[in-house]
Amino acid sequence: MAVYNYDVVVLGSGPAGEGAAMNAAKAGRKVAMVDSRRQVGGNCTHLGTIPSKALRHSVRQIMQFNTNPMFRAIGEPRWFSFPDVLKSAEKVISKQVASRTGYYARNRVDLFFGTGSFADEQTVEVVCANGVVEKLVAKHIIIATGSRPYRPADIDFHHPRIYDSDTILSLGHTPRKLIIYGAGVIGCEYASIFSGLGVLVELVDNRDQLLSFLDSEISQALSYHFSNNNITVRHNEEYERVEGLDNGVILHLKSGKKIKADALLWCNGRTGNTDKLGMENIGVKVNSRGQIEVDENYRTCVTNIYGAGDVIGWPSLASAAHDQGRSAAGSIVDNGSWRYVNDVPTGIYTIPEISSIGKNEHELTKAKVPYEVGKAFFKSMARAQIAGEPQGMLKILFHRETLEVLGVHCFGYQASEIVHIGQAIMSQPGEQNTLKYFVNTTFNYPTMAEAYRVAAYDGLNRLF
Protein backbone atom coordinates (compact mmCIF):
# COMPACT_ATOMS: atom_id res chain seq x y z
CA MET A 1 0.00 0.00 0.00
CA ALA A 2 1.50 3.30 -1.15
CA VAL A 3 1.36 6.21 1.31
CA TYR A 4 1.16 9.86 0.20
CA ASN A 5 1.29 12.98 2.37
CA TYR A 6 -0.70 16.14 1.64
CA ASP A 7 -1.69 19.41 3.22
CA VAL A 8 -5.27 19.06 1.99
CA VAL A 9 -7.22 16.09 0.65
CA VAL A 10 -10.57 16.81 -1.01
CA LEU A 11 -13.20 14.08 -1.36
CA GLY A 12 -15.32 14.72 -4.44
CA SER A 13 -14.63 16.66 -7.65
CA GLY A 14 -17.98 18.41 -8.13
CA PRO A 15 -18.35 22.19 -7.76
CA ALA A 16 -17.62 22.16 -4.00
CA GLY A 17 -14.59 19.91 -4.35
CA GLU A 18 -13.25 21.90 -7.27
CA GLY A 19 -13.65 25.21 -5.44
CA ALA A 20 -11.87 23.80 -2.39
CA ALA A 21 -9.00 22.19 -4.31
CA MET A 22 -8.33 25.24 -6.49
CA ASN A 23 -8.27 27.66 -3.55
CA ALA A 24 -5.98 25.46 -1.47
CA ALA A 25 -3.65 24.81 -4.40
CA LYS A 26 -3.42 28.49 -5.34
CA ALA A 27 -2.46 29.20 -1.72
CA GLY A 28 0.57 26.97 -2.16
CA ARG A 29 -0.74 23.87 -0.41
CA LYS A 30 -0.08 20.34 -1.62
CA VAL A 31 -3.51 19.04 -2.60
CA ALA A 32 -5.03 15.71 -3.62
CA MET A 33 -8.46 15.11 -5.10
CA VAL A 34 -10.35 11.82 -4.69
CA ASP A 35 -13.35 10.88 -6.83
CA SER A 36 -15.21 7.61 -7.29
CA ARG A 37 -15.56 8.20 -11.03
CA ARG A 38 -12.71 7.90 -13.48
CA GLN A 39 -13.41 11.46 -14.58
CA VAL A 40 -13.65 14.74 -12.70
CA GLY A 41 -16.79 16.85 -12.46
CA GLY A 42 -18.98 14.97 -10.01
CA ASN A 43 -22.71 14.44 -10.39
CA CYS A 44 -23.07 18.08 -11.44
CA THR A 45 -21.17 17.46 -14.67
CA HIS A 46 -22.17 13.88 -15.40
CA LEU A 47 -25.75 13.46 -14.16
CA GLY A 48 -27.12 16.75 -12.87
CA THR A 49 -26.69 20.41 -13.72
CA ILE A 50 -24.74 20.19 -16.97
CA PRO A 51 -26.68 17.44 -18.82
CA SER A 52 -30.08 18.68 -17.65
CA LYS A 53 -29.36 22.27 -18.69
CA ALA A 54 -27.91 21.17 -22.03
CA LEU A 55 -31.02 19.05 -22.50
CA ARG A 56 -33.22 22.01 -21.63
CA HIS A 57 -31.39 24.22 -24.13
CA SER A 58 -31.98 21.72 -26.95
CA VAL A 59 -35.65 21.34 -26.05
CA ARG A 60 -36.09 25.10 -25.94
CA GLN A 61 -34.60 25.39 -29.44
CA ILE A 62 -37.09 22.80 -30.69
CA MET A 63 -39.94 24.71 -29.06
CA GLN A 64 -38.81 27.98 -30.65
CA PHE A 65 -38.63 26.34 -34.07
CA ASN A 66 -42.08 24.81 -33.74
CA THR A 67 -43.74 28.03 -32.56
CA ASN A 68 -41.99 30.53 -34.84
CA PRO A 69 -44.38 31.56 -37.68
CA MET A 70 -41.46 31.97 -40.09
CA PHE A 71 -40.36 28.36 -39.64
CA ARG A 72 -43.93 27.07 -39.58
CA ALA A 73 -44.39 28.53 -43.06
CA ILE A 74 -41.66 26.16 -44.29
CA GLY A 75 -43.30 22.98 -43.06
CA GLU A 76 -44.86 21.05 -40.24
CA PRO A 77 -43.46 21.10 -36.68
CA ARG A 78 -40.50 18.81 -36.02
CA TRP A 79 -40.42 16.45 -33.05
CA PHE A 80 -37.34 14.75 -31.68
CA SER A 81 -37.05 11.75 -29.39
CA PHE A 82 -35.61 12.07 -25.90
CA PRO A 83 -32.50 9.97 -26.76
CA ASP A 84 -31.81 12.15 -29.82
CA VAL A 85 -32.00 15.35 -27.81
CA LEU A 86 -29.82 13.83 -25.09
CA LYS A 87 -26.91 13.46 -27.54
CA SER A 88 -26.26 17.20 -27.41
CA ALA A 89 -25.85 16.99 -23.64
CA GLU A 90 -23.25 14.25 -23.97
CA LYS A 91 -21.06 16.53 -26.10
CA VAL A 92 -21.14 19.24 -23.44
CA ILE A 93 -20.19 16.74 -20.71
CA SER A 94 -17.01 15.69 -22.52
CA LYS A 95 -16.02 19.32 -23.03
CA GLN A 96 -16.59 20.10 -19.35
CA VAL A 97 -14.51 17.11 -18.25
CA ALA A 98 -11.64 18.17 -20.50
CA SER A 99 -11.73 21.75 -19.18
CA ARG A 100 -11.88 20.75 -15.54
CA THR A 101 -9.17 18.12 -15.88
CA GLY A 102 -6.98 20.91 -17.21
CA TYR A 103 -7.69 23.04 -14.13
CA TYR A 104 -6.32 20.34 -11.83
CA ALA A 105 -3.28 19.74 -14.01
CA ARG A 106 -2.37 23.44 -14.19
CA ASN A 107 -2.69 23.81 -10.42
CA ARG A 108 -0.74 20.61 -9.72
CA VAL A 109 -3.53 18.86 -7.88
CA ASP A 110 -3.01 15.08 -7.73
CA LEU A 111 -6.03 13.05 -8.82
CA PHE A 112 -6.99 9.70 -7.31
CA PHE A 113 -9.89 7.82 -8.88
CA GLY A 114 -11.49 5.25 -6.60
CA THR A 115 -13.65 4.81 -3.52
CA GLY A 116 -12.28 6.90 -0.66
CA SER A 117 -13.06 6.31 3.02
CA PHE A 118 -11.69 7.46 6.37
CA ALA A 119 -9.27 5.17 8.21
CA ASP A 120 -8.89 7.84 10.88
CA GLU A 121 -9.14 11.62 11.24
CA GLN A 122 -6.08 12.25 9.07
CA THR A 123 -6.06 9.26 6.75
CA VAL A 124 -8.11 8.46 3.67
CA GLU A 125 -7.81 5.07 1.99
CA VAL A 126 -8.64 4.96 -1.71
CA VAL A 127 -9.60 1.65 -3.31
CA CYS A 128 -8.86 2.08 -7.02
CA ALA A 129 -10.71 0.31 -9.83
CA ASN A 130 -7.83 -2.15 -10.26
CA GLY A 131 -8.00 -3.13 -6.60
CA VAL A 132 -4.92 -1.19 -5.54
CA VAL A 133 -5.28 0.65 -2.22
CA GLU A 134 -3.66 4.08 -1.82
CA LYS A 135 -3.28 5.73 1.59
CA LEU A 136 -3.50 9.53 1.73
CA VAL A 137 -2.39 11.23 4.94
CA ALA A 138 -3.48 14.87 5.26
CA LYS A 139 -3.40 17.74 7.71
CA HIS A 140 -6.88 18.78 6.56
CA ILE A 141 -9.65 16.91 4.75
CA ILE A 142 -12.65 18.44 2.99
CA ILE A 143 -15.75 16.31 2.40
CA ALA A 144 -17.44 17.39 -0.84
CA THR A 145 -18.99 14.13 -1.97
CA GLY A 146 -22.30 15.66 -3.04
CA SER A 147 -25.67 13.94 -3.00
CA ARG A 148 -27.83 11.51 -4.91
CA PRO A 149 -31.61 11.11 -5.33
CA TYR A 150 -33.41 9.89 -2.22
CA ARG A 151 -34.82 6.41 -2.87
CA PRO A 152 -37.57 5.06 -0.59
CA ALA A 153 -37.01 1.37 0.16
CA ASP A 154 -40.52 0.39 -0.97
CA ILE A 155 -40.04 1.57 -4.56
CA ASP A 156 -38.38 -0.72 -7.11
CA PHE A 157 -35.92 1.56 -8.88
CA HIS A 158 -34.61 -1.42 -10.87
CA HIS A 159 -37.93 -1.57 -12.72
CA PRO A 160 -37.43 -0.45 -16.36
CA ARG A 161 -40.27 2.09 -16.10
CA ILE A 162 -39.20 3.75 -12.83
CA TYR A 163 -36.46 6.41 -12.83
CA ASP A 164 -34.86 9.00 -10.59
CA SER A 165 -33.12 12.22 -11.63
CA ASP A 166 -29.83 10.34 -12.17
CA THR A 167 -31.13 7.37 -14.15
CA ILE A 168 -33.57 9.39 -16.28
CA LEU A 169 -30.64 10.21 -18.54
CA SER A 170 -30.62 6.54 -19.58
CA LEU A 171 -34.24 6.69 -20.79
CA GLY A 172 -34.20 5.04 -24.21
CA HIS A 173 -37.55 6.24 -25.54
CA THR A 174 -39.95 9.18 -25.40
CA PRO A 175 -42.94 8.37 -23.16
CA ARG A 176 -46.37 9.58 -24.20
CA LYS A 177 -47.22 10.30 -20.58
CA LEU A 178 -44.88 10.75 -17.62
CA ILE A 179 -45.54 10.96 -13.88
CA ILE A 180 -43.09 13.16 -11.96
CA TYR A 181 -43.34 12.68 -8.20
CA GLY A 182 -41.91 15.68 -6.39
CA ALA A 183 -42.42 19.26 -7.53
CA GLY A 184 -39.21 20.75 -6.22
CA VAL A 185 -36.63 22.44 -8.42
CA ILE A 186 -35.56 19.24 -10.21
CA GLY A 187 -39.12 18.03 -10.68
CA CYS A 188 -40.27 21.34 -12.16
CA GLU A 189 -37.27 21.54 -14.47
CA TYR A 190 -37.88 18.06 -15.88
CA ALA A 191 -41.60 18.78 -16.17
CA SER A 192 -40.70 21.68 -18.48
CA ILE A 193 -38.25 19.58 -20.49
CA PHE A 194 -40.61 16.68 -21.14
CA SER A 195 -43.55 18.99 -21.79
CA GLY A 196 -41.41 20.71 -24.42
CA LEU A 197 -40.98 17.34 -26.13
CA GLY A 198 -44.75 16.93 -26.34
CA VAL A 199 -45.05 14.56 -23.38
CA LEU A 200 -48.14 14.75 -21.16
CA VAL A 201 -46.82 15.34 -17.64
CA GLU A 202 -48.50 14.60 -14.30
CA LEU A 203 -46.58 16.59 -11.68
CA VAL A 204 -47.41 15.37 -8.17
CA ASP A 205 -46.65 17.80 -5.34
CA ASN A 206 -46.95 17.05 -1.61
CA ARG A 207 -47.31 20.78 -0.86
CA ASP A 208 -50.07 23.26 -1.65
CA GLN A 209 -47.92 25.55 -3.82
CA LEU A 210 -45.19 25.08 -6.39
CA LEU A 211 -41.74 26.06 -5.09
CA SER A 212 -43.14 27.75 -2.00
CA PHE A 213 -39.80 29.42 -1.18
CA LEU A 214 -40.29 31.69 -4.20
CA ASP A 215 -42.19 34.95 -4.24
CA SER A 216 -45.85 33.92 -4.44
CA GLU A 217 -46.49 35.90 -7.63
CA ILE A 218 -43.61 34.14 -9.39
CA SER A 219 -44.82 30.75 -8.15
CA GLN A 220 -48.31 31.48 -9.43
CA ALA A 221 -46.92 32.54 -12.81
CA LEU A 222 -45.11 29.21 -13.10
CA SER A 223 -48.27 27.29 -12.17
CA TYR A 224 -50.27 29.16 -14.80
CA HIS A 225 -47.61 28.52 -17.43
CA PHE A 226 -47.53 24.81 -16.58
CA SER A 227 -51.31 24.51 -16.90
CA ASN A 228 -51.07 25.89 -20.45
CA ASN A 229 -48.35 23.43 -21.47
CA ASN A 230 -49.61 19.88 -20.95
CA ILE A 231 -48.52 19.76 -17.30
CA THR A 232 -51.16 18.74 -14.77
CA VAL A 233 -50.13 19.70 -11.23
CA ARG A 234 -51.66 17.75 -8.34
CA HIS A 235 -51.08 19.46 -4.99
CA ASN A 236 -51.24 18.04 -1.44
CA GLU A 237 -50.79 14.47 -2.60
CA GLU A 238 -48.57 11.75 -1.11
CA TYR A 239 -47.72 8.41 -2.61
CA GLU A 240 -48.96 5.19 -1.05
CA ARG A 241 -47.18 2.82 -3.41
CA VAL A 242 -45.77 2.58 -6.91
CA GLU A 243 -46.88 -0.32 -9.09
CA GLY A 244 -44.60 -1.20 -11.99
CA LEU A 245 -46.20 -2.85 -15.02
CA ASP A 246 -44.80 -4.32 -18.21
CA ASN A 247 -46.24 -1.43 -20.20
CA GLY A 248 -46.22 1.38 -17.66
CA VAL A 249 -46.51 2.51 -14.04
CA ILE A 250 -49.43 3.13 -11.70
CA LEU A 251 -48.94 5.63 -8.88
CA HIS A 252 -51.29 4.97 -5.96
CA LEU A 253 -51.89 8.06 -3.82
CA LYS A 254 -52.98 8.19 -0.18
CA SER A 255 -55.99 10.26 -1.25
CA GLY A 256 -57.30 7.20 -3.09
CA LYS A 257 -56.43 8.50 -6.55
CA LYS A 258 -54.51 6.43 -9.08
CA ILE A 259 -52.44 7.75 -11.99
CA LYS A 260 -51.18 5.60 -14.85
CA ALA A 261 -48.40 6.58 -17.23
CA ASP A 262 -45.68 5.10 -19.41
CA ALA A 263 -42.97 5.92 -16.86
CA LEU A 264 -42.39 7.52 -13.46
CA LEU A 265 -39.64 9.98 -12.55
CA TRP A 266 -38.96 10.21 -8.81
CA CYS A 267 -37.74 13.68 -7.78
CA ASN A 268 -38.55 13.80 -4.09
CA GLY A 269 -35.49 14.72 -2.07
CA ARG A 270 -31.73 14.12 -2.02
CA THR A 271 -29.41 12.05 0.17
CA GLY A 272 -25.85 13.02 1.05
CA ASN A 273 -23.14 10.68 -0.22
CA THR A 274 -21.68 9.74 3.16
CA ASP A 275 -22.66 6.09 3.60
CA LYS A 276 -19.37 4.74 2.18
CA LEU A 277 -17.00 7.24 3.80
CA GLY A 278 -16.44 5.38 7.06
CA MET A 279 -17.78 8.27 9.11
CA GLU A 280 -17.88 6.05 12.18
CA ASN A 281 -14.07 6.03 12.12
CA ILE A 282 -13.85 9.79 12.68
CA GLY A 283 -16.84 10.49 14.92
CA VAL A 284 -18.73 12.74 12.50
CA LYS A 285 -22.47 12.08 12.65
CA VAL A 286 -24.85 12.36 9.72
CA ASN A 287 -28.59 13.09 9.77
CA SER A 288 -31.37 10.94 8.33
CA ARG A 289 -30.62 12.27 4.85
CA GLY A 290 -26.91 11.49 5.03
CA GLN A 291 -25.91 15.13 5.50
CA ILE A 292 -23.19 16.39 7.84
CA GLU A 293 -23.35 19.41 10.13
CA VAL A 294 -20.78 22.19 9.84
CA ASP A 295 -20.21 25.57 11.48
CA GLU A 296 -19.85 28.94 9.73
CA ASN A 297 -16.26 28.05 8.81
CA TYR A 298 -17.54 24.82 7.18
CA ARG A 299 -15.75 22.82 9.89
CA THR A 300 -17.29 19.64 11.28
CA CYS A 301 -17.07 18.55 14.91
CA VAL A 302 -13.59 17.25 14.05
CA THR A 303 -11.32 20.29 13.86
CA ASN A 304 -9.34 19.29 10.75
CA ILE A 305 -12.29 17.97 8.73
CA TYR A 306 -14.58 20.25 6.73
CA GLY A 307 -17.68 19.87 4.58
CA ALA A 308 -19.11 21.77 1.62
CA GLY A 309 -21.74 21.44 -1.09
CA ASP A 310 -24.80 19.21 -1.22
CA VAL A 311 -23.38 16.94 1.48
CA ILE A 312 -24.07 19.67 4.07
CA GLY A 313 -27.60 20.39 2.77
CA TRP A 314 -28.99 23.87 2.07
CA PRO A 315 -29.03 25.46 -0.45
CA SER A 316 -27.97 22.51 -2.66
CA LEU A 317 -27.03 24.67 -5.64
CA ALA A 318 -23.95 24.15 -7.81
CA SER A 319 -23.14 27.87 -7.60
CA ALA A 320 -23.30 27.88 -3.81
CA ALA A 321 -21.39 24.60 -3.56
CA HIS A 322 -18.39 26.05 -5.41
CA ASP A 323 -18.27 29.05 -3.08
CA GLN A 324 -18.74 26.85 -0.01
CA GLY A 325 -15.82 24.68 -1.09
CA ARG A 326 -13.68 27.73 -1.75
CA SER A 327 -14.60 29.14 1.67
CA ALA A 328 -13.86 25.84 3.43
CA ALA A 329 -10.39 25.90 1.91
CA GLY A 330 -10.17 29.59 2.84
CA SER A 331 -10.73 28.65 6.47
CA ILE A 332 -7.74 26.32 6.21
CA VAL A 333 -5.26 28.47 4.29
CA ASP A 334 -6.38 31.77 5.90
CA ASN A 335 -5.86 33.84 2.75
CA GLY A 336 -8.85 36.14 3.22
CA SER A 337 -11.09 34.14 0.89
CA TRP A 338 -13.46 32.80 3.56
CA ARG A 339 -17.05 33.97 3.68
CA TYR A 340 -20.24 32.38 4.88
CA VAL A 341 -22.24 31.72 1.72
CA ASN A 342 -25.80 32.92 2.33
CA ASP A 343 -26.43 35.54 -0.37
CA VAL A 344 -26.90 33.11 -3.24
CA PRO A 345 -29.25 33.82 -6.15
CA THR A 346 -31.72 31.06 -6.90
CA GLY A 347 -31.67 29.82 -10.49
CA ILE A 348 -34.44 27.47 -11.63
CA TYR A 349 -34.17 26.31 -15.23
CA THR A 350 -37.78 25.70 -16.07
CA ILE A 351 -39.03 26.94 -19.45
CA PRO A 352 -39.20 29.95 -18.96
CA GLU A 353 -36.58 30.16 -16.24
CA ILE A 354 -36.81 31.71 -12.79
CA SER A 355 -34.25 33.52 -10.68
CA SER A 356 -34.36 35.53 -7.48
CA ILE A 357 -32.25 36.98 -4.71
CA GLY A 358 -33.12 38.63 -1.43
CA LYS A 359 -36.43 38.80 0.38
CA ASN A 360 -39.87 38.04 -1.02
CA GLU A 361 -43.13 39.85 -0.21
CA HIS A 362 -44.23 37.35 2.41
CA GLU A 363 -40.95 37.66 4.32
CA LEU A 364 -40.98 41.46 4.24
CA THR A 365 -44.61 41.65 5.33
CA LYS A 366 -43.97 39.25 8.20
CA ALA A 367 -40.97 41.34 9.29
CA LYS A 368 -43.11 44.52 9.08
CA VAL A 369 -40.72 46.19 6.63
CA PRO A 370 -42.32 49.13 4.75
CA TYR A 371 -41.60 48.04 1.20
CA GLU A 372 -42.92 48.88 -2.24
CA VAL A 373 -42.94 46.96 -5.53
CA GLY A 374 -41.77 47.86 -9.02
CA LYS A 375 -42.59 45.64 -12.00
CA ALA A 376 -41.60 45.35 -15.64
CA PHE A 377 -43.57 42.97 -17.86
CA PHE A 378 -41.55 41.39 -20.64
CA LYS A 379 -44.40 41.60 -23.15
CA SER A 380 -43.70 45.36 -23.30
CA MET A 381 -39.91 45.06 -23.60
CA ALA A 382 -38.46 45.53 -27.09
CA ARG A 383 -35.81 42.82 -26.67
CA ALA A 384 -38.39 40.28 -25.51
CA GLN A 385 -40.62 41.16 -28.47
CA ILE A 386 -37.69 40.70 -30.87
CA ALA A 387 -36.79 37.35 -29.30
CA GLY A 388 -40.39 36.18 -29.34
CA GLU A 389 -40.31 35.70 -25.56
CA PRO A 390 -43.20 37.77 -24.18
CA GLN A 391 -43.83 35.67 -21.05
CA GLY A 392 -42.47 36.89 -17.78
CA MET A 393 -41.67 39.83 -15.58
CA LEU A 394 -39.04 41.47 -13.39
CA LYS A 395 -40.11 42.42 -9.89
CA ILE A 396 -38.08 44.66 -7.56
CA LEU A 397 -38.88 44.98 -3.86
CA PHE A 398 -37.46 48.08 -2.18
CA HIS A 399 -37.75 50.03 1.07
CA ARG A 400 -40.24 52.83 0.46
CA GLU A 401 -38.33 55.29 2.67
CA THR A 402 -34.65 54.59 1.97
CA LEU A 403 -35.14 53.08 -1.53
CA GLU A 404 -32.82 50.22 -0.55
CA VAL A 405 -33.29 47.24 -2.90
CA LEU A 406 -34.47 44.32 -0.75
CA GLY A 407 -35.26 41.64 -3.29
CA VAL A 408 -35.25 40.90 -7.01
CA HIS A 409 -37.50 38.25 -8.56
CA CYS A 410 -37.60 37.36 -12.23
CA PHE A 411 -39.61 34.93 -14.34
CA GLY A 412 -38.99 34.60 -18.06
CA TYR A 413 -36.39 34.88 -20.80
CA GLN A 414 -32.80 35.14 -19.48
CA ALA A 415 -33.99 35.42 -15.86
CA SER A 416 -30.88 33.70 -14.49
CA GLU A 417 -28.69 36.32 -16.21
CA ILE A 418 -30.89 39.33 -15.44
CA VAL A 419 -30.87 38.72 -11.68
CA HIS A 420 -27.14 39.40 -11.37
CA ILE A 421 -27.59 43.13 -12.01
CA GLY A 422 -29.85 43.36 -8.99
CA GLN A 423 -27.46 41.18 -7.01
CA ALA A 424 -24.59 43.56 -7.74
CA ILE A 425 -26.55 46.59 -6.50
CA MET A 426 -27.84 44.78 -3.41
CA SER A 427 -24.27 43.96 -2.41
CA GLN A 428 -23.23 47.62 -2.38
CA PRO A 429 -22.68 49.22 1.04
CA GLY A 430 -25.04 51.73 2.63
CA GLU A 431 -26.71 54.30 0.40
CA GLN A 432 -25.08 52.87 -2.73
CA ASN A 433 -27.74 50.17 -2.65
CA THR A 434 -30.56 52.26 -4.05
CA LEU A 435 -33.37 51.94 -6.56
CA LYS A 436 -32.23 55.23 -8.09
CA TYR A 437 -29.22 53.45 -9.62
CA PHE A 438 -31.52 51.87 -12.20
CA VAL A 439 -33.07 55.23 -13.07
CA ASN A 440 -29.76 57.06 -13.38
CA THR A 441 -27.90 54.36 -15.36
CA THR A 442 -27.83 54.13 -19.16
CA PHE A 443 -28.65 50.60 -20.33
CA ASN A 444 -27.92 49.24 -23.79
CA TYR A 445 -31.01 49.22 -25.97
CA PRO A 446 -32.73 46.95 -26.70
CA THR A 447 -31.78 44.62 -23.84
CA MET A 448 -33.53 42.61 -21.18
CA ALA A 449 -31.44 44.49 -18.61
CA GLU A 450 -33.39 47.70 -19.17
CA ALA A 451 -36.32 45.99 -17.44
CA TYR A 452 -34.65 47.27 -14.26
CA ARG A 453 -35.23 50.87 -15.31
CA VAL A 454 -38.85 50.16 -16.24
CA ALA A 455 -39.45 48.40 -12.92
CA ALA A 456 -37.71 51.19 -10.99
CA TYR A 457 -39.91 53.87 -12.56
CA ASP A 458 -42.97 51.73 -11.85
CA GLY A 459 -41.96 51.44 -8.20
CA LEU A 460 -41.19 55.13 -7.77
CA ASN A 461 -44.56 56.01 -9.27
CA ARG A 462 -46.23 54.10 -6.43
CA LEU A 463 -44.67 56.31 -3.75
CA PHE A 464 -46.51 59.29 -2.26
Swiss-Prot record:
GO terms for biological process: 2-oxoglutarate metabolic process; NADP metabolic process. It catalyses: NAD(+) + NADPH = NADH + NADP(+). Pfam families: Pyr_redox_2 (PF07992), Pyr_redox_dim (PF02852). Its EC number is 1.6.1.1. It is an enzyme of class 1 (oxidoreductase). Its cofactor is FAD. Binds 1 FAD per subunit. It comes from Pseudomonas fluorescens (strain SBW25). FAD binds at D35, S36, R37, R38, Q39, V40, G41, G42, N43, C44. The gene is sthA. It is found in: Cytoplasm. Keywords: Cytoplasm, FAD, Flavoprotein, NAD, NADP, Oxidoreductase. GO terms for molecular function: dihydrolipoyl dehydrogenase (NADH) activity; flavin adenine dinucleotide binding; NAD(P)+ transhydrogenase (Si-specific) activity. It comes from the Bacteria. One of its GO terms (cellular component) is cytosol. Transmembrane segments: none annotated. This is Soluble pyridine nucleotide transhydrogenase. Conversion of NADPH, generated by peripheral catabolic pathways, to NADH, which can enter the respiratory chain for energy generation. The keyword Transferase does not apply.
